[in-house]
Curated annotation (Swiss-Prot):
PANTHER family: PTERIN-4-ALPHA-CARBINOLAMINE DEHYDRATASE. The keyword Nucleotide-binding does not apply. Pfam families: Pterin_4a. It comes from Burkholderia mallei (strain ATCC 23344). It comes from the Bacteria. This is Putative pterin-4-alpha-carbinolamine dehydratase. It catalyses: (4aS,6R)-4a-hydroxy-L-erythro-5,6,7,8-tetrahydrobiopterin = (6R)-L-erythro-6,7-dihydrobiopterin + H2O. GO terms for molecular function: 4-alpha-hydroxytetrahydrobiopterin dehydratase activity. The lineage of its organism: Bacteria, Pseudomonadati, Pseudomonadota, Betaproteobacteria, Burkholderiales. One of its GO terms (biological process) is tetrahydrobiopterin biosynthetic process. The keyword Lyase applies.
Length: 101
């Protein structure tokens, strides 16, 4: 069973995620990324989609042209879990050439 992060776990885990912010009114984190163009943004989304499918953990996201907004929360746990942190680190790695939007 997946458990939500405790407040101490959340504090420790989120310290390493510099571009992520808490979502107001939800136990979730979000990040916006800006790429050179739509093709680069879509390529990023494809890489994340493949990883998300492998993890069986899917992000909420929104894309317009070169911008991708990502929200992470684990629905089964009704909040942030280790899965969200792992996927956020993967997103940071594959999106490292993007600008914070």
């Amino acid at each position: 069973m997946i458990h939500k992060l405790t407040s101490e776990e959340r504090k420790t885990q989120l310290e390493s995620l510099h571009h992520w912010t808490a979502v107001p009114g939800r136990d979730a984190i979000q990040r916006s990324l800006r790429f050179a163009d739509f093709n680069e943004a879509f390529g990023f989304m494809t890489r994340v989609a493949i990883k998300a499918q492998e993890m069986n953990h899917h992000p909420e996201w929104f894309n317009v042209y070169n911008r991708v907004d990502v929200t992470l929360s684990t629905h089964d746990a009704n909040g942030l879990t280790e899965r969200d942190i792992k996927l956020a680190h993967f997103i940071d790695e594959v999106g490292k050439h993007a600008k914070a939007a």
